[in-house]
Amino acid sequence: MKKLLFTFLVIFLTSCASHDKQNKHHRTKITVEALQKDVVYTHKQLVKMHPDLYWYTSKEALDKKFDSLAQSITEPLTPNEFYHKISPIVSSVRQGHMSMNMFQLTSPDSLKKKYKGSTHPLSHFEYEYLDDRLFIERNRSRKDSILQKGTEILSINGIKPIDLFKKYRPTFTSDGFNETAIPYFFARKVNSYYVNELGFVDSVTIKASCADSVFYHTIKRTFKKSKRLLKQVEDSLQKNKIVDSDSLRKLSKKEQQIKRSAIKEQRKKQSFQKKWFGYDEKNKTYAKEVLFPVATDSTTAILKIRNFSEGKIKVYDTIFSVLHANNVEDLIIDLRGNPGGRLNDIHRLSRYLNDSAFVFTQPATITHRATYFNLLKGKSIPAQVFASPFIGIYSLVRGVSAKRNEDGLLQVPLKSSKYINPKPLNYTKNIYVLTDGMTFSAAAIISSHLKGRNRAIFVGEETGGTFNGTVAGVMPVLKLPHSKLKLRVGLMTIKPTQQTKEEGYGVKPDIYIKPTIGDFLNETDPALEYILKEIEQRH
């Protein structure tokens, strides 16, 4: 027993990262030999793990890029200087799920307690990047509401968004040759890019523009309040409360029981809705939501799906029950801004959108039978210890089930790669799908399925994810031995059954409508308005 406790103690202590050590590594120049070893390591791991490494670039071209990179390193570099050299090579594979992360500064060990739970000055903002201009899309801060939706960011601590875009654009990619995802990806990553440029700071000064006026605004880091301070606030409120509870009539035991039961029932309903529809506490939104855009007509409905990661997949029973109960004639599925999620989620959804048996995807392609053991790579020591038995069994079962197809590819059967029937509550009437450049991964696969089966009319932008599939599924994160940069790699090629001859591009809309800066500032939705007008004219 003592040996077991000692083992767990050692694991815990070795897993506790030193901030000072991390910051020192951030500033340390790594030797040429060590960096060249990281280049070789990255290349070897990609060849070993990635099932479609040469989908959009040839083996010869990629080999040459890695060789040239190794030869071009002639002086020591910091981890982030090295990042700007190796990440463009990784992004040249043109797989949007595969990415590298920079090495970030953090608080020193001496101030670890002070900064624990604090939030970076920019962490409350979400953005839109339109025509090389950065706008605030959402400000979640409760304390500082000066910068609201529509405010243009001209610079942060003197760094212009366009300069940031030019510097970091080579370091990330979408799937294939499609460029529609790039502005959306940049908008999602822009805070991390500014953090990398500015370092660990307590405040930033933003130069902004709103309603034709330019101004400067300083935002400070938010610190978590101490328990002592919270107690003082509670005591103050208690002393200054307007109504003394002793002056109110006390409820009888029966009334108290009725009140408790009502509160319990209400909380139960709220909990059910949040769990099943995937409630996001940070943004106060649901992953899946049914809306009726015309107040006087319930026959037109919008199914807004923000992601396929949150909520229960069985929620579609509830959703399509609502659609049937309202005799919905026209269903608008809004997949804009949807980065993807679970394969079993979109597979489940597809069963409500077809009227005959179908196969949703092809079997997944992997590099070798032991590929799933790579899931342990990049995990902390405690995670490896506790996860090893489960991942070991899972990897063994999946590896044994893999078989070679007629082209010699090693493929793993999926639930979605078998014939399946529609659900009893399947929707068979008119479907419109709204897409944009952030319709990615699983959201692009369900789009390919509906487009390939001529099941829907598509309106908006070309999807960011390609028509013919993606490399994702399970994605371990590797840590390069010397630079300590992190590399995420997809292990499974997942392709929809429906395919197109044009490789490297997304699902293209039947009606192309790209929102303008004016649409964003005026909060108008031309794509949705087009569909609603078409439905109105048809009726």
Task: Please give the residue ranges for each predicted region.
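Conserved acidic, small-residue-rich alpha-beta core segments centered on
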Residues: 151, 343-520
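Sec-dependent N-terminal signal peptides
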Residues: 4-13
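Flexible, low-complexity junctional segments that flank or bridge functional domains
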Residues: 17-331, 335-365, 381, 467-479, ...
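Intrinsic disorder/low-complexity segments
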Residues: 12-15, 413-414
